[in-house]
């Protein structure tokens, strides 16, 4: 795509194109290189009238091309208002933009429009409560979770799941993992089956049965979405998702 031949131990996972101050793209012509920020300052009409009227003289998006070799972490993006307040609050506390504990690196929200360049699977938002209950009740080891959800709000329920200790995670997940090991190896599990993605993620991320990740439970709570080449999906603020 970009004419580079990556070493086997250094795959190219992401290519970002945009005018974010932290790492703007560059434009190169016969006269040399220029940052996209500088180019747009000198040539704001390049943005187009409609964009300038709505967003001003800044590029209003960041284009990312991803090659997802392994499951990525679950993300949840703030609204514009939340991002602005969070950014200012961390500035007031003196948290540096380069600090690893920093949550808000800028004032912008991060809605995502994703277009599949090939066959692609992702997690997109919570299923309905009825769908979650049906999924949990279909698996004996997850029925205690269904009982929890029957007495808690989804927010309380999800917080408890994500804070579960290893013993609890083992009680929930190990029976499923053990029962599906052979069907998974034989290619007998459908890709819309959350059990498949639990086994796949453990294999891809080298997750050991004695060190389970609470995020594995999310395969039973979120919508598993399949996109074909050329199809797209929108992740608005507040929608948990993972590629």
State the predicted function of each range.
Residues 11-13, 109-111, 221, 229, ...:
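A generic structural signal for well-ordered coil/turn residues at beta-strand boundaries
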Residues 16, 62-65, 125, 204, ...:
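Residue-level preference for alpha-helix termini and adjacent loops
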Residues 1-188:
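Transition-metal
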Residues 157-231:
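Double-stranded beta-helix
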Residues 74-75, 227-243:
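Conserved metal-binding segment of the jelly-roll/cupin
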Residues 56-58, 108, 217-220, 226, ...:
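Short solvent-exposed loop/turn micro-motifs enriched in small/polar/acidic residues
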């Amino acid at each position: 795509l970009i004419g580079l031949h990556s070493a086997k131990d250094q795959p190219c996972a992401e290519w970002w194109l945009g005018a974010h101050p932290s790492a703007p793209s560059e434009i190169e012509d016969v006269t040399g290189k220029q940052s996209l920020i500088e180019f747009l300052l000198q040539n704001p009409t390049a943005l187009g009238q409609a964009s300038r009227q709505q967003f001003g003289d800044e590029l209003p998006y960041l284009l990312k091309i991803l090659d997802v070799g392994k499951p990525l972490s679950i993300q949840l993006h703030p609204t514009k208002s939340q991002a602005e307040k969070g950014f200012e609050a961390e500035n007031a506390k003196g948290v540096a933009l380069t600090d690893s504990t920093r949550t808000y690196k800028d004032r912008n929200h991060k809605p995502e429009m994703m277009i599949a360049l090939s066959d692609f699977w992702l997690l997109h938002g919570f299923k309905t409560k009825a769908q979650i209950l049906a999924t949990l009740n279909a698996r004996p080891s997850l029925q205690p979770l269904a009982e929890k959800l029957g007495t808690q709000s989804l927010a309380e329920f999800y917080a408890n799941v994500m804070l579960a200790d290893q013993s609890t995670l083992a009680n929930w997940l190990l029976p499923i993992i053990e029962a599906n090991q052979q069907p998974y190896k034989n290619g007998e599990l459908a890709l819309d089956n959350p059990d498949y993605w639990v086994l796949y993620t453990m294999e891809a991320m080298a997750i050991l049965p004695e060190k389970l990740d609470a995020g594995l439970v999310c395969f039973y709570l979120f919508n598993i979405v399949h996109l074909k080449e050329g199809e797209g999906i929108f992740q608005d603020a507040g929608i948990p998702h993972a590629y």
